[in-house]
C-alpha cells in the first residue's frame, strides 16, 4: 500500500510545496519540490528532527539522524537520514525537481512524517568541506524556509 505526504514550505521570501510518495516500505521515496524565492545557486535540502516550527525553522532541531551518523551526500552510506543534498535554483523562476531517495521513509519507526523539511541559504558541502560544521550540517547556512511533513491523500 503506497503512502504520500506533503510539506508546505514557508519563509520570509521562500515558499513552496514538497510532495513525498513511497510505494511500499522497501521502495525509495520520490520527492517532488516546487519552491519560489530562492537566490541563484545550490541550497541545502534536509529533513530535520522535529515537527516544531513554533520558533520558525530554528525549532526544527538538527538534521534527522536516528542512527548517529555523520552528515553526508545522499549517495553516501555514512549520512543522516535527513540528508537530501542540494536543490538548484536559477534565481528567476520556480525551483522544481524530483529526488529519489532510498534512506528516508514514510513507513515505520523512522518515518519522516511529522518532521520538518528545511531549505537552507547555502550549498550543502555534503560533509566534505572541511569546515567545523561540515560533518553536522554540511555548512548549509541559515534556514530560509520550512514546513512540517504531514500525511496526505
UniProtKB/Swiss-Prot annotation:
Keywords linked to the UniProt accession: Antioxidant, Copper, Disulfide bond, Metal-binding, Oxidoreductase, Zinc
Cofactor: Cu cation; Zn(2+)
Positions that bind Zn(2+): 63, 71, 80, 83
Positions of Cu cation binding: 46, 48, 63, 120
Keyword set includes Oxidoreductase: yes
Metal-binding is among the record's keywords: yes
Induction, as annotated: By H(2)O(2) exposure but not by UV irradiation.
Domain of life of the native organism: Eukaryota
Reaction catalysed by this enzyme: 2 superoxide + 2 H(+) = H2O2 + O2
GO biological process, alphabetically ordered: aggregation involved in sorocarp development; removal of superoxide radicals; response to bacterium; response to cadmium ion; response to curcumin; response to hydrogen peroxide; response to oxidative stress; superoxide metabolic process
Function summary: Destroys radicals which are normally produced within the cells and which are toxic to biological systems.
Gene Ontology MF, one: superoxide dismutase activity
Protein name: Superoxide dismutase [Cu-Zn] 1
Gene Ontology cellular-component annotations: extracellular matrix; phagocytic vesicle
Principal EC category: oxidoreductase
Coiled coil: none
E.C. number: 1.15.1.1
Family: Belongs to the Cu-Zn superoxide dismutase family.
Cysteines paired by S-S bonds: 57-146
Xref: CDD domains: Cu-Zn_Superoxide_Dismutase
